Amino acid sequence: MPPIRLVLPALCLALSAGCSCPMAASGGWEAGLRQELPRMGHRNFIVIADSAYPLQSSPGIKTIHVGGTQAETLKKVLALLAQQKHVRPIAWMDAEQSKVAEADAPGIGQCRKDLAAALAGANVQTAAHMDIIKKLDESSKLFNVILIKTDETLPYTSVFLELDCGYWNGEKEARLRAALGETK
């Protein structure tokens, strides 16, 4: 076992390295996200998570707690994304959310309405929670994920924003592949 005089400095260094997320910088999380967005691109994720969402150990996932509700945080994130020309979000929602009963989770109905209003006009996809988590885990092995944790205490309300290219789409890619003589 190494002497404590070697372990303690290493532990302090490791803990301080984990706090380097620019999202926690002065100016608040919104200023930090505004600073990060130009560096992000397609395949990056921004997750707006409920309060029970676990702190993940993957080095590609940066977590910050901002408080507030899912809907108000989502609106702020989407407003910042709308200012970007290089990316556009694809919102992934848990399919389970639509089946959660008000009796089991008081407030879920209003939360659904608030999230739907925040996502009006957005590209929204649904999938089973574990399928979205697998997609996020795979992505975080190669690409950064920003996880914004709220104070929401309702199940299956996390919104997973998968960033896509803002100036290119599937149709254009298909035409390019056809011009190159590639088939699927």
Predicted regions mapped to residue ranges:
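Feature captures the catalytic cores and cofactor-binding loops of soluble hydro-lyases/lyases
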Residues: 54-55, 63-89, 109-126
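Glycine-rich, aromatic-bearing surface loops/beta-hairpins
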Residues: 104-184
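Long, hydrophobic N-terminal alpha-helical segment
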Residues: 20-71
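Structural motif
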Residues: 44-47, 62-63, 88-92, 123-124, ...
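Bacterial N-terminal signal peptides
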Residues: 7-18
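C-terminal catalytic "cap/lid" subdomain
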Residues: 32, 67, 86-87, 146-149
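Ordered, amphipathic secondary-structure segments that act as subunit-interaction surfaces
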Residues: 86-110
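Positively charged n-region of N-terminal signal peptides that target proteins for export
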Residues: 1-6
